[in-house]
Every structure is written in C-alpha cells, then in structure tokens.
Amino acid sequence: MKKLSILAAFITGAIMVQAQIDSSAKNLSKFEKIPSFNMYIVPDSTSFSNKNLKTNKSLVIMFFSPDCEHCQKETRELLAYKNELKNIQILMASPSSYGMVKQFYEEYNLASMPNIKLGNDVNYALGSIYQLRTFPSIFVYDRTGKLAKAFVGNIGVPAILEALK
C-alpha cells in the first residue's frame, strides 16, 4: 500500500511538472464562463459542483498541488488577506490524492476561511478542461460568472483583487 501511495505521488508530480497554461486570448475565450465540474471537498468528502456556487458572487478558482512551494506561498497570502477576500468564493482544486489535500487543508487551517472550498479534482477532470500545466494557476470570475483574468504562477492576492475591480 505504501509503495502504491509513493507511485501515485510520483505520477501526480510528473503530471504537474508538465508546465504552462496557454494564455493566448484565443484559448482563454474557452473559459469565459465557469465550466461544469464536480469534486470532493475536504474535510468530509462532500460532493461539490458548479451548481453549489453562489450566484452573483465573484469566484477565484486556484489549481494547486499540496507539495508546490508557490502554491503554499499563495495559500499563506490568501490567509493573510482573509478580510479582503471574505465576500469572494474561492475554489482550490488539486489532482493530488484526497489524503494529501486534506492534510494541506488542516496544515494551513483553511477551515478559518469558510469561503474557501478545497478539494480533490477527481481524474483531473477540471484541470484538463483548463489544460493546466503549471501550479498554481488561477482563474478569476466576476459576479456575472465571466472570466475576468487568468494567472499562471504565484501572483499574489493584490493582483486577484485588482482583476475583480
């Protein structure tokens, strides 16, 4: 079982090393609206889909890996800007195992931000819609559900807040 876990972690890491989102305007137009998705969120494996999102609220989708240093830094920054982000829905999705995602959730005390939903992107379904190659990758949607901005890499919360103005 331990060998299987190590193999799964290695495969996940290999997938994540294949970097870069194609951020050309032509390709970003595919993501103008929030796509349909379903994932299992921590801490209780509850199913969460695009139908569970609140309407008329901005949304930030952050694709991450628990072992990515840039993702860890971005997460610490989200926590530091807790008050500024309290009215923004944040969906953090990872292709890593549910156990790794749950450990990340607990380690960063993400329960302290109820507007964050963090979960396992089963079979990399949502990540493949966005054709992800880099973590973190961040997609910012305005209150109407239209894509405001897409970011690749650690960009900081001020850039996210600016995209929502």
Regions found by a protein language model. Name each.
Residues 134, 140-165:
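Thiol-/selenol-based redox modules, centered on thioredoxin-like
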Residues 1-25:
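Bacterial Sec-dependent N-terminal signal peptides
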Residues 35, 58-59, 135-136:
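Short loop/turn microsegments at loop-to-beta-strand junctions
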Residues 39-40, 63, 140:
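Hydrophobic beta-strand positions
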Residues 108-139:
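Short, internal strand/loop/helix patches
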Residues 20-51:
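N-terminal "domain-start" segment that seeds a small globular fold
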Residues 49-72, 78:
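Short active-site neighborhood of thiol/selenol oxidoreductases, capturing the structured segment around
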Residues 72-110, 125-128:
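Structural microenvironment flanking redox-active thiols in thiol-disulfide oxidoreductases
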